[in-house]
Amino acid sequence: MTTLTLNTSLLSSRRILAAFSGGLDSTVLLHQLVLWRERHPDVTLRAIHIHHGLSPHADSWVRHCETVCERWQVPLVVERVTLADNGLGIEAHAREARYRAFAQTLLPGEVLATAQHLDDQCETFLLALKRGSGPAGLSAMGERSPFAGTLLLRPLLRETRKTLEQWAVRHGLCWIEDESNQDDAYDRNFLRLRALPLLQQRWPHFPAAVARSATLCAAQERLLDELLASDLTDCITTEGTLRLSPLMSMSDVRRAAILRRWLAMRNAPMPSRDALERIWQEVALARDDASPCLRFGDHEIRRYQSQLWWIKSVAGQHETTVAWPAWQTPLALPAGLGTVQLVPGGELRRPREEESVSIRFKAPGVLHIVGRNGGRKLKKIWQEQGIPPWRRDTTPLLFYGETLIAAAGVFVTREGAAEDKEGVSLVWHA
């Protein structure tokens, strides 16, 4: 193996963060990048090691990585992550935590390099095949992918695991062996330890053939992206919701492709074919007076005003009251709703000395709001302002004593209007 692949993949990258577990693959990657840096003195190279805490050897792995990086004069960042059961399985959760740490560590202008190789590509393809994935899932991994506002590079993706081993032995590299890699209870380990050796014994070039199929699937997806671009433009609103009216006249296949691409744009997990059918039948086609909802993990799909919405699930706060005695400072809201703050300059009057300040999420009675004649109940105001039902009991309402002053970002009541230039604004950082 030469550095030719690295030359191609990293041609324009001069600031590199390498994912470094200390195993064979990432050790070869880091060694290759060190050689690349020697040939290109303007390259800045760092490494990051993720301490998952899953193995009793995790601390010794950190020390090993520190030793290697010190020898190669590569600054090392060690990030410790805490894993909890999120229903996705330990493999998926560890990966999610790992990439979140990568994103948080990247510096401006820096790209992330990871050590996936041809055998990994084959395993990823077969796992997607086992799940019944379509062309998007079977596209597997690309050598370059958008990530955290920059790029994720996989410079070794064309190389086999055997080639990496030969390189490591030839150059006297030392690496660690994660004992969990020998546990074939994990699907990926089962493929690597049992299934792929058997397939390669019969068909030696099986991983390369699978990689070609993945590349063809990716090309088909790019073509579909181009062909459906105008449809997406017609369907997606400036708020990122999906208009239903254009979808009604589409074929099932075309509509499903639009739904998948919309969900991908919202960073949602790719739904199965059955899930797409449920989205259409149970949410999009629900009766007009319904408020349909379909949960996907900690998010949900809703319909409102003939549009589909992808939103984070938040428990209603209808009965919640949050006192705000120090109203001059920001107030943290419950249920991850963010913070509110009263800032100088605005159309709200300041609270009087005898008035207590609080945030609530319901308001009884008839309300009179600035800019509208007559009184109306809060439900009617929400409807007139186009506030979706799920936001109505999570939108902060500012009270002085028992008087409603304002709804964050929606309206000000007559009782809350400032009479001078010393007013304030209610700012909600959701």
Curated annotation (Swiss-Prot):
The alphabetical list of record keywords is:
ATP-binding, Cytoplasm, Ligase, Nucleotide-binding, tRNA processing
Coiled-coil stretches are: none
Q: What is a single molecular function from GO for this protein?
A: ATP binding
Cellular compartments per GO CC: cytoplasm
Q: Where in the cell is it found?
A: Cytoplasm
Amino acids binding ATP? S21, G22, G23, L24, D25, S26
Superkingdom of the source species:
Bacteria
Which reaction equation describes what this protein catalyses? Answer: cytidine(34) in tRNA(Ile2) + L-lysine + ATP = lysidine(34) in tRNA(Ile2) + AMP + diphosphate + H(+)
The EC number on file is 6.3.4.19
Question: Which Pfam families does this one have?
Answer: ATP_bind_3, TilS, TilS_C
- Which cysteines are cross-linked by disulfides? none
Q: What biological processes does GO assign it?
A: tRNA modification
Q: Which residues does UniProt assign to the signal peptide?
A: none
Q: Which SMART domains match?
A: TilS_C
Q: What class of enzyme is it?
A: ligase
> Sorted alphabetically, which InterPro entries does this protein's record hold?
Lysidine-tRNA-synth_C, Rossmann-like_a/b/a_fold, TilS/TtcA_N, tRNA_Ile_lys_synt, tRNA_Ile_lys_synt_N, tRNA_Ile_lys_synt_subst-bd
Q: What is known of its domains?
A: The N-terminal region contains the highly conserved SGGXDS motif, predicted to be a P-loop motif involved in ATP binding.
- Identify its protein family: Belongs to the tRNA(Ile)-lysidine synthase family.
- Its biological function? Ligates lysine onto the cytidine present at position 34 of the AUA codon-specific tRNA(Ile) that contains the anticodon CAU, in an ATP-dependent manner. Cytidine is converted to lysidine, thus changing the amino acid specificity of the tRNA from methionine to isoleucine.
Q: What is the name listed in the Swiss-Prot or TrEMBL entry for this protein? A: tRNA(Ile)-lysidine synthase
Whose protein is this, by species? Salmonella choleraesuis (strain SC-B67)
User: Which taxonomic lineage does the organism of this UniProt entry have?
Assistant: Bacteria, Pseudomonadati, Pseudomonadota, Gammaproteobacteria, Enterobacterales
Q: Which gene holds the coding sequence for this protein?
A: tilS
